[in-house]
Design a protein with these regions (language model features):
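A structural signal for short secondary-structure junctions
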Residues: 302-303, 335-337, 353-356, 382, ...
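C-terminal and late-domain segments of enzyme folds
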Residues: 326, 442-523
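Active-site proximal loops enriched in glycine and acidic residues that flank catalytic Cys/His/Asp
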Residues: 35, 65, 232, 259, ...
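Flexible phosphate-sensing "switch/lid" loops adjacent to ATP/NTP-binding sites
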Residues: 28-337, 347-353, 359, 366-367, ...
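N-terminal amphipathic/basic-hydrophobic helices that include classical n-h-c signal peptides
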Residues: 1-26
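Cysteine-nucleophile active-site neighborhood
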Residues: 47, 51-52, 353-445, 500, ...
Length: 523
């Protein structure tokens, strides 16, 4: 009898040990990144950190972007104010930071990786109208915070990095900070790491008061950072790090200097040199091999430079074409040339400069304004055989320009001229979003570049080509189609228009074939 009891107790002991180990293995590690100001580079920090953690540890890494604004998503946001709207594979229209995440991590994100106040409120109000709260008074705490946590826990990954957009202490972000405080309690401190990014202004010397005050705001909410990343114009002195360590209660080794770099692709190397990802790995006690780190930017000597002109509607906004800019940089790396982008407002084009550049790109842009300059840029590219790529609306304008100046037919898009007698492009009613399959003609440049008859590309447009006029395209060919025209070419020169957005799928290690071949032709 005693032996049986011992055997039973032994079995229960090992069974419980097994359960604990399984729970430990499956528990995600959560890293929350907040900021004392908007625009400090939280997205870049998250992307660099995620990439390093993915490289150095045998763990999956995902990122969530929290935007405190009341918009449900970024679809109606003005690019002049907010930058580009980045489209995911599933058609979700998101903040441009998700594009940075995809490029740095080389993964495809979904709608679950983006959380906004508007999205959370919409879910809560829909649930309330359906009676799912059983007559309870619906409140920010616990219902809003619970919904935020529910969305966070939907992401299944070994490591989950959460970027809290906006500014700590603002009315909009306060409730999210409360939700993240609750997250820390639910998962345990050993599975939670707080990173706070603060700006250090320079007035004769670096000032640390702004950092001290923003950390104090976090503490008032019951949440304090484990790491402080300091954004500054120039390299920090050791005494400044020590001062921040003493006043903010963070180890001096966890005070990170993130001073200005030539471009964002140098940031990951700078952070690695300061043992930032290494210290986070040690904080979580994760097995890692630090020798596996490789910078995102290839270490090559590039001496050749080429000028590529982007003629667009939003060129005065530095982030309106961020994915396009990055795609050209990646293509330059692959072809070993420095791509110098000439930004040209479509309302004020410089024809002399257009004749001197190595390639011209007309990107997308909703609305009927600022058209004439784009049409003229397309005409110059076509007539002078300057390599040309028209993206989305740029493709539509390439067709309109060709009809006008080659076929001598004054057609238009109903977006530009609703009462046009020759509607070359008409409204599809619903916005076409996300990944779509496209079939390529085998005797085309597109097929040569993609090396495949079937491709998938991301879309964001409402207007499509009117196939009634297809047979009039004398000298211009439609070489890619879905249920509408997707790609147009002019044989004999590098002239291509695409209805989709190739820039959303270009990565540092997987340069999109259109940008790769455009830069190869231009150099």
């Amino acid at each position: 009898m005693i032996i049986k009891v011992l055997i039973l107790n032994t079995k229960l002991f090992f069974k419980n040990i097994f359960k604990v180990n399984i729970f430990y293995i499956k528990m995600s590690k959560y890293i929350v990144v907040s900021g004392s100001l908007s625009g400090l580079g939280k997205g870049t920090t998250c992307a660099c950190l995620a990439r390093s953690l993915k490289q150095l540890t045998d763990n999956t890494v995902q990122i969530i972007k929290i935007d405190p604004y009341l918009n449900v998503n970024a679809s109606h946001m003005n690019p002049f104010e907010h930058g580009e709207v980045f489209v995911l594979e599933d058609g979700t229209e998101t903040d441009l930071d998700l594009g940075t995440y995809e490029r740095f991590l080389d993964i495809d994100l979904t709608y679950e990786n983006s959380i906004t106040s508007g999205q959370v409120f919409l879910d809560i109000l829909n649930s309330e109208r359906k009676g799912e709260y059983n007559g309870k008074t619906v409140q920010l705490v616990p219902h809003f915070t619970d919904k935020v946590l529910e969305k966070i826990f939907k992401i299944k990954s070994d490591i989950v990095i959460i970027e809290l957009g906006g500014t700590v202490g603002d009315n909009e972000s306060y409730i999210f900070t409360e939700a993240l405080r609750q997250l820390r309690i639910k998962v345990g401190k050993e599975n939670f790491c707080g990173i706070h990014i603060s700006y250090l202004p320079i007035l004769e010397e670096m000032k640390t008061k702004t950092t001290q005050h923003s950390v104090r705001k976090l503490r008032e909410i019951g949440y304090e950072p484990d790491f402080i990343v300091c954004r500054c114009k120039k390299e920090m002195k050791n005494e400044t790090k020590t001062k921040i360590s003493n006043t903010c209660g963070v180890s001096v080794n966890n005070v990170i200097d993130m001073h200005d770099q030539k471009d964002i692709f140098d940031v990951s190397q700078m952070l690695f040199n300061q043992n930032f990802p290494q210290n986070i790995i040690k904080y979580f006690r994760l097995p890692a091999d630090f020798s596996l780190f490789t910078p995102i930017k290839p270490i090559i000597n590039i001496n050749d430079n080429i000028d590529i002109c982007i003629v667009g509607k939003y060129t005065n906004s530095c982030n309106a074409y961020l994915s396009l800019e990055n795609s050209l940089i990646f293509a330059g790396w692959k072809n070993q040339v420095n791509v110098n982008i000439i930004w040209m407002d479509s309302e004020n084009i410089d024809e002399n400069k257009l004749h001197d550049v190595k390639a011209i790109i007309v990107p997308g842009g909703f609305g009927s304004g600022r058209i004439s300059g784009k049409l003229r840029a397309i005409q110059i590219a076509r007539q002078n055989k300057i390599p040309f790529l028209g993206i989305c609306f740029g493709m539509q304008l390439a067709v309109i320009e060709y009809f006008k100046n080659v076929i001598c037919i004054e057609g238009n898009s109903t977006e530009i001229e609703p009462d046009t007698k020759i509607p070359l492009f008409y409204s599809n009613q619903d916005l076409i979003l996300g990944n779509k399959k496209i079939i390529l003609e085998k005797d085309s440049s597109a097929y040569e570049y993609y090396k495949s008859e079937e491709i998938n590309e991301r879309h964001r447009h409402r207007y499509v080509f009117n196939n009634y006029y297809k047979n009039l395209l004398d000298g211009m060919k439609i070489t890619g189609s879905s249920n509408f025209a997707e790609i147009i070419e002019i044989p004999g020169q590098w002239f291509m228009g695409v209805q989709f957005h190739p820039e959303f799928k270009s990565r540092p290690n997987k340069v999109h074939p259109l940008f790769d071949n455009l830069i190869f032709k231009a150099k």
